[in-house]
Amino acid sequence: MFVSIQELVTLASNQNKSISEVMIEQEMEMTQQSREFIWAKMEKNLQTMKQAVERSVQGQGVFSPTGLTGGDAVKMKKYREKGKTLSGDKILAGVQYALGTNEVNAAMGLVCATPTAGASGTLPGVVFSIADSMNFTHEQQVRFLFTASAFGMVVANNAMISGAMGGCQAEVGSASAMSAAAAVEAAGGTPQECSEAFSIALGNLLGLVCDPVAGLVEIPCVKRNAIGAGNALIAADMALAGITNVIPADETIEAMRSIGRRMPSELRETGLGGTAGTRTGLAIKMRIFGQDVSLEKEEE
């Protein structure tokens, strides 16, 4: 059993096992289910992610009932096909898949919460991007999810994964860090390098607020998932290059928890502060719900 990232890394290193294998064995022990049963459940998660990504680029794309989001995954796909991108195709593939997944979520479609529905695009963005470019097998993709879940479980148990409790750092931040760690293992990195990637990725997004316009998981949520995917890929490459993070992963999680607890309620999923509290954000809320609930009036 492990309750911290350090314990996870030590366990994997001492037993000469991958983090994904450690997670599979712990899940078997905790649930008293067979390896085949646990593997099949994770395969279902992977299939759900894949279906959302594929749906997002059918025709003109998917659009939310409000019309606030939709069609950006198709735009990114067409842009990638031109072959003249600034960021490189691997990162932009991740961006496309992340955008698409969250557009499906905003359109009331089926997604896999990783770790939440609002942050459901980042991890699929990363796993399918590197699966494309590195020709990953189905097994490697499933193991990617187990690795990510090991890190995510520690975050959930030791801090928070909901925007209502800790801001978007707890949602997209956690998703990005989980994805970075899993990407490192998938690329052949060590458990310690997975931990470094995790802490780099999460550290980059500390303090990120949750400020959904009109209280809907659309603006800025969809694009934040895309940025989370890019952040994860960059953090993974940094770790694989031998770059380390001065602040250990567990302490980075502690920092996120501390920041989240200090974050005002207006910046924790209430749809009152940040971008939600801008003039444009309030106008959108007024148009959708027909009531003026500006933060300024509530403070009066």
Task: Annotate each PLM feature.
Residues Y79, N102-C112, V155-M165, P212-V217:
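Glycine/charged-rich beta-loop-alpha catalytic/anionic-binding loops adjacent to active sites
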Residues L86, A113-S120, D132, T137, ...:
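Glycine- and small hydrophobic-enriched segments that form the cores of compact globular domains
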Residues N105, C112-A117, A148, A159, ...:
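Short glycine- and Lys/Arg-enriched binding-loop motifs that mark or flank ligand-binding interfaces
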Residues G163-E171, A175-S176, A180-A186, P191-E300:
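A structural signal for small-residue-enriched, beta-sheet-centric alpha/beta enzyme cores
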